[in-house]
Amino acid sequence: MDAKTDDKGAGKCPFSGGSHGHRNRDWWPDQLDISVLHNNSKKSDPMGAAFNYAEEFKKLDLEAVKKDLHALMTDSQEWWPADFGHYGGLFVRMAWHSAGTYRITDGRGGAGAGQQRFAPLNSWPDNANLDKARRLLWPIKQKYGSKISWADLMVLTGNVALESMGFKTFGFAGGRADVWEPEELYWGPEGTWLGDERYSGERQLAEPLGAVQMGLIYVNPEGPNGNPDPVAAAKDIRETFARMAMDDEETVALIAGGHTFGKTHGAGDPSLIGPAPEGGLLEEQGLGWTSKYGTGFGADAITGGPEVIWTQTPTQWSNHFFENLFGFEWELDKSPAGAKQWKAKGAEATVPDPFDPAKKRVPTMLTTDLSLRFDPIYEKISRRFLENPDQFADAFARAWFKLTHRDMGPRERYLGPEVPKEELIWQDPIPAVNHELVGEADIEALKAKILASGLSVAQLVSTAWASASTFRGSDKRGGANGARIRLAPQKDWEVNQPAELAQVLGKLEAIQGEFNGAQKDGKKVSLADLIVLGGAAAIEKAAKDAGTAVKVPFTPGRMDASAEQTDVESFKVLEPRADGFRNYINTKRHQFMHPEEALVDKAQLLTLTGPELTVLVGGLRVLGANYAHSTHGVLTERPEKLTNDFFVNLLDMGTKWTKANGEVEIYEGRDRKNGELKWTGTRVDLVFGSHSQLRAFAEVYACSDAQEKFVSDFVAAWSKVMNADRFDIVAKKQAA
């Protein structure tokens, strides 16, 4: 049919693709957004359900790809010529900025999915002209097709760039599968590029953010808010790099190592730069930042403000960065673009011009470079690197590997011939299986022992959930494998109820010891497996007691990590501020989300869908998995039985819900007729009746014929969480 026309006569498509009308979020901005649970669904994946990236990568001739990348480094293109005749600096920056969005608070960001191709990252001010880097790579991506993802190719290119400039890298692992749509992440509250509303008090950076301004990877190179104070800048550097899991030595190594190569681009007035890729014209074909200054590229390129070349050999690995940093005094200067930067005082022109061999420049530095000299902690490290170039090279190689692989998870996910053999503490290592695994008869006998131990359904379910639900699909950390729930810091987390946890683990360890001691053939069961098996046994019992027979899938093979394999500080970031699945909020820590938002956030980290989130909350409530045995949301008269009572009673129109007097975020459900108190609940409970989409899911499980479906779906979602970190199983399937 014909589209309606407005008063100006322009046709308007009545469908969403051509309309600029209001969406639900525009009308109701405070509406809980659960769309993140269905981000990057299979429907947006053009590769199809049968595609296995790991299998494709194994077919890749990595040496051939690297040979092509080496050739590209010096194959300068007219449309975007290489500085100094070598693209190395550009590609190092591309790989760095692909990985550098990683943040430890929630494990999101990073190089693992090739998100630099999509908005907003492809249009961040800090990523200006990296679109050109990816276009330079396109012929190589096109040549090798599905055998190498964009995510892997960007990191590999950074490695090859370093190697082509004489640096020995620590290694490379493939295995990063591409996604096909932007990740819906919270990057900050600002509505303008380079805004910094994320600070409060004494420059306290809001969590979970890891950068100082909207659209930057880390810090402002001119200094905090453009203030050229190296000492103040050091504070920003330390905070932002720490939020990317880097310590002081790694930070110094990364900054100095990265700035050994290439240059920054501030040749002229930045107001002459066109819009970023996402705001560009159709005919620009996804390229952005088209400049009207001179030719717009080469010697006239503008990427940001500063125009800095750090070393005398910007296409070769050297120790010139530190030699220059400490060898000169520095005076404040301005770039041709008007940005604050520093030049070596009274220095000879020893630095090459990127395009005119007859010209030389004096060494220049950024405010954030000088932080490595004027911050006392950074200075000590920097002087050691100055005097010991071999230590600097090793530190940079290791820090670069960590930067580009931090969000890949355990070593089982690493692919390719260049995977380093050394096991690193930040990889959260777990021992390889070194014994025969339990069989079906053993599993049934162990379940019977667990159920006869005196531990309740609630205790077993809570412990298994506490162990497995630390998993983060973002950076593939956490999970039940390793049984780190018995180690610091997890054993002491408030949410895990340490005293009761110790009691449960003590009984499970006794069962483990008795079983392992009785075996004659080397067969063993790990505590990690036993914790998960205890949850399975409890769920089977709870379902049976509710009149529904079910078998919870269980695959042995988890192992127990040691304290020596566990970085306590690194694991502290996995402690939940809130866990809506257990109706828990840590009142001692700042909450930057409403409880129901935190629930959705955790569900997304667990890779759950909306229906899976719904069925898990309903099941965990009736099983008694609440923190501190709270009765909030336990909407059943039959606790520890796996019934659909939570949904039935929540949606009962005979109950009227009101806020409890004097109780923060607690609600009372009273009989509509006589006012008698029936239930209490939290925001996390009531959202399943309030939010229209979650209510629709809840209605499915509240129906009179839904009990079997509820149990089946709960077991499936439960098993998904219990096995979320079983990359060993995936690796075995791929090897078979």
Swiss-Prot record:
Residue runs in coiled coils: none
Enzyme Commission number(s) of this protein: 1.11.1.21
Cofactor(s) named in the record: heme b
GO molecular function terms attached to this record: catalase activity; heme binding; metal ion binding
Disulfide links within the chain: none
Reaction(s) this enzyme catalyzes, per UniProt: H2O2 + AH2 = A + 2 H2O; 2 H2O2 = O2 + 2 H2O
Pfam families: peroxidase (PF00141)
Cross-linked residues, Tryptophyl-tyrosyl-methioninium (Tyr-Met) (with W-96): Y218-M244
Crosslink site: Tryptophyl-tyrosyl-methioninium (Trp-Tyr) (with M-244): W96-Y218
Ranges of biased composition (kind: Basic and acidic residues): 1-10
Ranges for region Disordered: 1-26
Chain residues that bind heme b: H259
UniProt keyword terms in alphabetical order: Heme, Hydrogen peroxide, Iron, Metal-binding, Oxidoreductase, Peroxidase
A cellular component term, taken from the record's GO annotations: cytosol
Site (Transition state stabilizer): R93
Gene Ontology process terms (BP): cellular response to hydrogen peroxide; hydrogen peroxide catabolic process
Residues spanning the signal sequence: none
Cofactor mode of binding and number, as noted: Binds 1 heme b (iron(II)-protoporphyrin IX) group per dimer.
Keyword Heme among UniProt keywords: yes
NCBIfam families hit by this protein: cat_per_HPI, PRK15061.1
Stated role: Bifunctional enzyme with both catalase and broad-spectrum peroxidase activity.
Family of this protein: Belongs to the peroxidase family. Peroxidase/catalase subfamily.
Quaternary structure, from the entry: Homodimer or homotetramer.
PANTHER family on file: CATALASE-PEROXIDASE (PTHR30555:SF0), HYDROPEROXIDASE I, BIFUNCTIONAL CATALASE-PEROXIDASE (PTHR30555)
Name of the protein in question: Catalase-peroxidase
Lineage: Bacteria, Pseudomonadati, Pseudomonadota, Alphaproteobacteria, Hyphomicrobiales
